[in-house]
């Protein structure tokens, strides 16, 4: 009976010592948070293991995560997966649907990224357009008009300049045959008769004003179809056209005239652009929006993934994942780190404490046996 009591007593004492030892050991992982000194001597085991080695632990955690968890290869594989493709494409589709549903304008879209489009157009837009036009004039002012126009346009004009004769004669014939043409001829005759006085009075003894006007009208109409008249018109138009082509830009427009045109054009362009920017994109560019929703979303998702994949190494170096994790861990309060580790390893820490009680009890059992037989 005495022997059994000794064994039980030793088991209980051993279990208590083993359990408390493990509890203290676990506690000493975190506490104390700072070193304590007696006179000039630091008390052993202060601070605790984790507070003492926090920077080293942060470095190792960052290294493990960068080299074994969030590796470039793993991120690249995840980025190229079908799930990532679908997620990016879905996000693009959602933004496009919002664009259509909310009737967003270009101005509203740019305002979401803190860009005042109207202000940009009125300041930078005007200055940029005027600057580009003035630079163009300075550079090309001594060149001929023909050399400044696109070759295709010059060729087209060369081929169709003769058509101007037909157009001009047809328009003149239509005008002369119209009521307005008849009235204008009569008005000019009235003025002519009034200015010439007696000479015209003698002419009116043989012909009435109406017959004179009618005769003039018929002759002018006939003249528009006369081959010689058309040849003269063609020659005049061709000569003027050739003169226009060979004229230098600064002869057609001097610097002040060009500056005035540049100012007016820049104001017109920026005003027009500003007005268009206030219209919903779906109204302004319906076909483009349809293209975005139908095809471009998939292509854009592929492009984003491709570009991210190509530049992933550079991005990861710039992000410095290891340094970021180290910095973040080092900013945590020690209380928070203790709470975090206990939450993660709570079950395991309890098992360690239980194991301390069990091992202590087993050791106490053997110590009891030794105490009985020795």
UniProtKB/Swiss-Prot annotation:
Its family remark reads:
Belongs to the UPF0754 family.
Can you list the GO cellular component terms from the UniProt entry?
A: plasma membrane
Chief location of this protein?
Answer: membrane
| Segment forming the signal sequence | none
Could you tell me the membrane topology recorded for this protein? Multi-pass membrane protein
Cross-referenced Pfam families, in alphabetical order?
DUF445
User: Any idea where this protein resides?
Assistant: Cell membrane
Segments traversing the membrane: 4-24, 354-374
Does the record's keyword annotation contain Hydrolase? no
Q: Which InterPro entries match?
A: DUF445 (IPR007383), UCP032178 (IPR016991)
* Name under which the protein is recorded: UPF0754 membrane protein SaurJH9_1899
| Superkingdom | Bacteria
Record's keyword terms, sorted: Cell membrane, Membrane, Transmembrane, Transmembrane helix
Organism per entry: Staphylococcus aureus (strain JH9)
């Amino acid at each position: 009976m005495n022997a059994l009591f000794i064994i039980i007593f030793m088991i209980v004492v051993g279990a208590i010592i083993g359990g408390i030892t493990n509890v203290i050991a676990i506690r000493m992982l975190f506490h104390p948070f700072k070193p304590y000194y007696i006179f000039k001597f630091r008390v052993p085991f202060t601070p605790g293991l984790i507070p003492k080695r926090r920077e080293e632990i942060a470095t190792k955690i960052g290294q493990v995560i960068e080299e074994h968890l969030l590796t470039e290869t793993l991120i690249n594989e995840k980025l190229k997966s079908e799930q990532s493709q679908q997620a990016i494409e879905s996000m693009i589709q959602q933004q496009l649907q919002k664009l259509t549903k909310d009737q967003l304008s270009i101005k509203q879209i740019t305002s979401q990224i803190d860009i005042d489009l109207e202000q940009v157009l009125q300041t930078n837009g005007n200055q940029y357009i005027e600057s580009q036009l003035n630079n163009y004039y300075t550079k090309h002012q001594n060149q001929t008009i023909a050399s400044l126009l696109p070759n295709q346009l010059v060729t087209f004009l060369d081929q169709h300049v003769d058509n101007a004769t037909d157009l001009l004669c047809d328009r003149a014939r239509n005008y002369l045959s119209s009521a307005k043409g008849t009235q204008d001829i009569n008005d000019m005759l009235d003025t002519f008769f009034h200015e010439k006085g007696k000479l015209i009075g003698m002419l009116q003894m043989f012909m009435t004003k109406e017959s004179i006007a009618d005769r003039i009208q018929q002759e002018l109409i006939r003249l528009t179809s006369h081959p010689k008249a058309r040849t003269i018109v063609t020659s005049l138009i061709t000569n003027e056209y050739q003169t226009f082509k060979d004229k230098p830009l600064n002869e057609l427009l001097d610097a002040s005239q060009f500056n005035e045109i540049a100012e007016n054009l820049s104001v017109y362009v920026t005003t027009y652009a500003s007005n268009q920017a206030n219209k919903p994109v779906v109204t302004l560019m319906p076909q483009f929006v349809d293209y975005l929703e139908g095809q471009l979303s998939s292509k854009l998702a592929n492009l984003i993934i491709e570009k991210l994949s190509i530049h992933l190494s550079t991005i990861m170096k710039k992000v410095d994942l290891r340094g970021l994790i180290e910095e973040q861990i080092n900013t945590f309060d020690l209380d928070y780190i203790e709470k975090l580790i206990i939450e993660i390893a709570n079950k395991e820490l309890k098992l360690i404490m239980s194991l301390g009680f069990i091992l202590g009890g087993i050791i106490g059992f053997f110590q009891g046996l030794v105490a009985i037989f020795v």
